[in-house]
Amino acid sequence: MSAIGVIGGTGVYDPSIFENIHEESLMTPFGEIDYVQGTYHGKTVIFVARHGKDHTIPPHKINYRANIWGLKKLGVTFIISTTAVGSLNENFKPGHFVLTDQFLDFTKNRITTFYEGGDRPVAHLDVTNPYCPELRDILQKVGTEQGLTIHNGGTYVCTEGPRFETPAEIKMFHMLGGDTVGMTNVPEVNLANEAEMAYSTISMITNYAAGISEAALTHGEVVEMMGEMAAQLKSLILGAIDAIDVDARYDAHDRMHEYGGFKL
């Protein structure tokens, strides 16, 4: 039976929103992952805390390949991920939600693919639509019905971290078309696509990026805003889980057909 995966980012560690939960671990070829399995209205849900349940893993140290491989092994076909982001776009204000549709990759030291030769062919992932349009539409519909300010579309700039960005970097990202900035969406989105899972990110605007606002950036500010948005996020995720047809097949589920499909 197909499952829905939820990857919780900063401030999103509470799997108790689901039913029949139990904690498990799984060894993958890339290391061990911890996860929580539960149900919601009869659908199987797998929850992974991206930074660890105690927020001990910084963005550049996250084992992205283990997380995605593990979710695939557990039968996940849809992934809803959450990210806390800064805004480069004056129309995307703190407290708003953004359903990212494109990204700019400014990471430096991360392994971004499962396809490194050896047992796998040389493969070139098509990322024309890296964030599943059908899943984004579901989230947009649910969010709008719930009265959220939710933007369907936006370009996420992913930086290496763990430091925040300089005002000069933010100015450059804005000139390149960036709308939000964060540290975790790449390579997660690429790996999910290689593993042929429909993937969408709910980005929560927690602050304006450096230089957009004159105030200094703090992690505490991010966590505080996440706390304020937590109830809305919970309702959005649960509403989306209700709306997802786990038997549906989208382009994302056949992303690697040219290479014989993704094999564990």
Language model segments and positions:
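Short acidic/polar active-site loop segments enriched in Thr and Asp
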Residues: 77-78, 179, 198
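Zn-dependent metallopeptidase/amidohydrolase metal-coordination segment
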Residues: 183-221
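Non-catalytic positions within long, well-ordered alpha-helices that form the structural scaffold/packing
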Residues: 72-75, 174, 193
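Active-site rim beta-loop-alpha module in soluble metabolic enzymes
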Residues: 130-175
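Generic hydrophobic/aromatic pocket-lining and core-packing "Φ" positions
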Residues: 68, 170, 186-189
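Metabolite-binding pocket within alpha/beta catalytic cores that recognizes anionic/polar moieties
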Residues: 1-128
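His/Asp/Glu-rich mid-to-C-terminal helical/loop segments that flank catalytic regions of hydrolases
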Residues: 210-257
